[in-house]
């Protein structure tokens, strides 16, 4: 590009809308230095991705944030080995749903926190 060029270039920055979800594991899932991750899936175009969850001190639960335009609409919550830190199925100790053949649908009713049942085999969405 020449300094004397009559062509002008502009950049437009668009802020992506995000949504934060929360996860409340039971006491059993918190043992042995486990960490938590979520496997997110877009059922419309069959894309998926791993997200690590971080602990939210103020709410006493774990969280992850998705970009709304990515269209992820279902998840698998995973209890991961403390080490290695890589999110992949080989490092997943337990998951919900436990059937290995399904997902938990992300809520569309304003609820934003998945609370794991005491037996670790399911849970329900609540508002945090």
Q: Where are these predicted regions, by residue range?
A:
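Conserved "repeat-terminator" motif of extracellular CCP/Sushi domains
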Residues: 1-16, 125-128
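Short, surface-exposed beta-strand/turn "edge" patches of beta-sheet domains
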Residues: 1-7, 94-117
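Extracellular Ig-like/FN3 beta-sandwich strand-entry sites
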Residues: 4-6, 70-74
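Compositionally biased low-complexity segments at domain edges in trafficked proteins
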Residues: 14, 107-128
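Boundary/junction segments of secreted and surface-exposed precursor proteins
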Residues: 17-26
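Aromatic-rich carbohydrate-binding modules that target alpha-glucans
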Residues: 28-69, 81-94
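Short, aromatic- and glycine-rich surface loops/edge beta-strands on solvent-exposed regions
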Residues: 73-81
